[in-house]
C-alpha cells in the first residue's frame, strides 16, 4: 500500500528530499473550470454546493482529473464557522459573502456561543471522508480554515470590506471584547481543524487573508497570537500533521510566523522568495508564489515566470509551488496546464 508520507507534497512540507517541486493551486476547484460551473449551477448556489458532501466531493476531484496536481484541497468556505455561530451566511450576487446577523456591538460578542463543531459542521467532515475515500490514494488531502482575525473581520464588518473601519475601531477602543471574540474563534478553529484531521485530511492550512491590514504590533497581538495558539494545540494532538500558515501581504512578518511551530508558510507574490528562504528557510518550508495574473498571459510568459519562481527559491527541497493567492475565475484552463507542465519540466534540475 502506498505510504502517503512518501508523497512529494508531504515530503517537501517536511523539507525532505524530493525529485521535483510539488504543485497545487489555491482555489484549484473553482469557477475557471467549466465542469465546476456546471455542478455549481446544479447546486443552485455556492452555499448549497459547500453543504452537499457529494457535490463538494465532486468539485474537489475535478482538478485532479484534469491536471497532474500533487494534492487536493477540501472544497469548502472559510466562513462556515461564523455561519455555525448563527450569523446567517449568504452570498449576494456580485458582492461576495454577507451576514444577516453581523456582530454589531460588544454585547453580541459576549453572547456569541462557541458551536458544537462536530454536529454543526458535520457536512464538512462528511465531505472530507468521502473525498479521502474517492480520491487517488497516493495524493494528500489538505484541510483548511480562516484565521481567527480574518473570520472576525467578516463577522464585525458584516461581509467584505474596503477599509475594515469597524473591526479596527474595535481593536483600538474595545480591546477586551476583541480578544474575547478572537479567543472564541481560536477555540472553534482548533476544534474544526481537529475534526477535519479525524475525517482524513493529511495537512491543514490557515488562511489569514486580512492579517496584512494590521500594524506590526496589532498583527502580533490580534492575528499571530491566535494562530500560534491553534498551531500549538494541533501539534500537541497531531504532531505529524503539517500545518501551513498564510498571511496575505504578510511578507514582512515571516520570522514571527516561523516561530509558531508551523511547518510551512505561504507567501504571496509581493514577497521575494529567495530572501524569504534566507530569512526562514532553515525553520519552515515555503509555498508560493506566482502572481495569479501571470495565468492570464501567454505560454511563453507563463513558462518564463514559473522558471523565475523556481530559480528564486533555488536548489533543494522545502518549496511547494503555488500561486501567491487564489486562482481567478477568468483564467483559461489550458494556461493552468502550461504552468503545471512547466513546474514538472523545469523543477527537477533543482533537486539533483
Curated annotation (Swiss-Prot):
Enzyme Commission no: 4.1.1.37
Reaction(s) this enzyme catalyzes, per UniProt: uroporphyrinogen III + 4 H(+) = coproporphyrinogen III + 4 CO2
Compartmental location: Cytoplasm
Keyword match Cytoplasm: yes
Keyword Chloroplast: no
UniProt GO cellular component terms: cytosol
UniProt pathway annotation: Porphyrin-containing compound metabolism; protoporphyrin-IX biosynthesis; coproporphyrinogen-III from 5-aminolevulinate: step 4/4
Residues the record marks as site: Transition state stabilizer: 77
Amino acids binding substrate: 27-31, 77, 154, 209, 325
Signal peptide range: none
CDD domains, per the entry: URO-D
Record GO terms (molecular function): uroporphyrinogen decarboxylase activity
GO biological process: protoporphyrinogen IX biosynthetic process from glutamate
Main enzyme class: lyase
Entry keyword set: Cytoplasm, Decarboxylase, Lyase, Porphyrin biosynthesis
Disulfide cross-links: none
A Pfam family assignment: URO-D
Similarity remark: Belongs to the uroporphyrinogen decarboxylase family.
Function: Catalyzes the decarboxylation of four acetate groups of uroporphyrinogen-III to yield coproporphyrinogen-III.
Subunit structure comment from the entry: Homodimer.
Name of the protein in question: Uroporphyrinogen decarboxylase
Originating organism: Legionella pneumophila subsp. pneumophila (strain Philadelphia 1 / ATCC 33152 / DSM 7513)
Amino acid at each position: 500500500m502506498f505510504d502517503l508520507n512518501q508523497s512529494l507534497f508531504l515530503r517537501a512540507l517536511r523539507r525532505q528530499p524530493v525529485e521535483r517541486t510539488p504543485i497545487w493551486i489555491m482555489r484549484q476547484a473553482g469557477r475557471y473550470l467549466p465542469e465546476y460551473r456546471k455542478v455549481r449551477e446544479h447546486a443552485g448556489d455556492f452555499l448549497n454546493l459547500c453543504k452537499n458532501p457529494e457535490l463538494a466531493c465532486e468539485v474537489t476531484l475535478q482538478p485532479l482529473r484534469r491536471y497532474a496536481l500533487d494534492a487536493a484541497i477540501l472544497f469548502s468556505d472559510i466562513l462556515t464557522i461564523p455561519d455555525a455561530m448563527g450569523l446567517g451566511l449568504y452570498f449576494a450576487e456580485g458582492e461576495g459573502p454577507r451576514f444577516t446577523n453581523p456582530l454589531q456591538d460588544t454585547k453580541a460578542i459576549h453572547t456569541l456561543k462557541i458551536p458544537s463543531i462536530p454536529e454543526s459542521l458535520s457536512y464538512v467532515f462528511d465531505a472530507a471522508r468521502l473525498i479521502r475515500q474517492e480520491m487517488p490514494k497516493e495524493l494528500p488531502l489538505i484541510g483548511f480554515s480562516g484565521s481567527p482575525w480574518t473570520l472576525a473581520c467578516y463577522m464585525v464588518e458584516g461581509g467584505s470590506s474596503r477599509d475594515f473601519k469597524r473591526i479596527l475601531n474595535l481593536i483600538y477602543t474595545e480591546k477586551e471584547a476583541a480578544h474575547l471574540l478572537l479567543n472564541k474563534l481560536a477555540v472553534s478553529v482548533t476544534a474544526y481543524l481537529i475534526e477535519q484531521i479525524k475525517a482524513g485530511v493529511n495537512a491543514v492550512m490557515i488562511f489569514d487573508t486580512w492579517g496584512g491590514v494590521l500594524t506590526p504590533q496589532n498583527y502580533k497581538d490580534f492575528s499571530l497570537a491566535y494562530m500560534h495558539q491553534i498551531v500549538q494545540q494541533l501539534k500537541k494532538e497531531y504532531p505529524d500533521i503539517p500545518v501551513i500558515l498564510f498571511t496575505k501581504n504578510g511578507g514582512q512578518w515571516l520570522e514571527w510566523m516561523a516561530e509558531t511551530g508551523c511547518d510551512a508558510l505561504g507567501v504571496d507574490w509581493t514577497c521575494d522568495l529567495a530572501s524569504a528562504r534566507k530569512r526562514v528557510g532553515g525553520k519552515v518550508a515555503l509555498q508560493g508564489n506566482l502572481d495569479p495574473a501571470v495565468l492570464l498571459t501567454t505560454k511563453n510568459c507563463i513558462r518564463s515566470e514559473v522558471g523565475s519562481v523556481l530559480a528564486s527559491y533555488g536548489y533543494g527541497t522545502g518549496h511547494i509551488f503555488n500561486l501567491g493567492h487564489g486562482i481567478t475565475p477568468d483564467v483559461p484552463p489550458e494556461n493552468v496546464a502550461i504552468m503545471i507542465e512547466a513546474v514538472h519540466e523545469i523543477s527537477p534540475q533543482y533537486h539533483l
